[in-house]
Amino acid sequence: MMRAWGNRADTFDVDEPFYAYYLSATGKKHPVADEVIASGETDWRKIIARLTGPIPNGKRIFFQKQMAHHLLPDVDREWLSGVTNCFLIRDPREVIASYVKKRDDPMLQDLGFMQQIEIFDFVRTRVKATPPVLDAKDVLENPGRILHRLCDAVGVEFSESMLSWPPGLRETDGSWAGHWYGEVAKTTSFRPYRPSRAKVPAHLEEICEHCREPYERLYEYRLH
């Protein structure tokens, strides 16, 4: 999704701006954690000030890719009611099967499902409207249709430039891109959906089931 929005001429994109704060606050030993902390902002108040300030480079749209679990409980949520929110979801089995390729022992709070539904409920209550929800499978099966619907939902004009982009990494990718974005860097468009053949390890089945309820709640609101 970041590639789609980042390829628009009118959009500036930012990649997981709370990641350095999250790693610094939790002490999580993620790959290249020291580099992420050194290159990023670790004060969540300053991060919010940046995200709610002027859009860089004179652009009209500020696309902010967030990970729900990076917004730890200490982070003030009120700023979220002043921005346009959209939620991207994915089947828990596919999330976990993908995650364990890089880190083999995630905990429930590492996967973001519980935080995602908490933030969704907060935003929905504050703005008195349901923010758009996209399911990753729907996006891959029909990217043009889903992105048209998303643009309509957030009040911007759809651009064909959202459907294809040059390969490679971007200046706006996080400092962790070399570790996490190898497959993304190869893409030039949305790849067709293919069910994951990877299996959820037996010791993570219980966590997977805990993720199912918030995922299915959000799935009810998805654009399709």
Regions found by a protein language model. Give the residues of each.
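Generic structural signal for helix capping and beta-alpha/helix-loop junctions
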Residues: 21-23, 95, 168
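Soluble or luminal CAZymes and related metallo-dependent hydrolases
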Residues: 39-46, 67-68, 108-115, 142, ...
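A polyampholytic, Gly/Pro-enriched intrinsically disordered region
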Residues: 33-42, 107-111, 177-189
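A generic fold-level signal
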Residues: 56-58, 80-81
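PAPS-dependent sulfotransferase catalytic core
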Residues: 1-57
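PAPS-dependent sulfotransferase catalytic domain
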Residues: 64-161, 175, 179-182
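Short N-terminal targeting/anchoring amphipathic segment
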Residues: 57-65
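PAPS-dependent sulfotransferases, especially Golgi type II membrane carbohydrate sulfotransferases
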Residues: 157-224
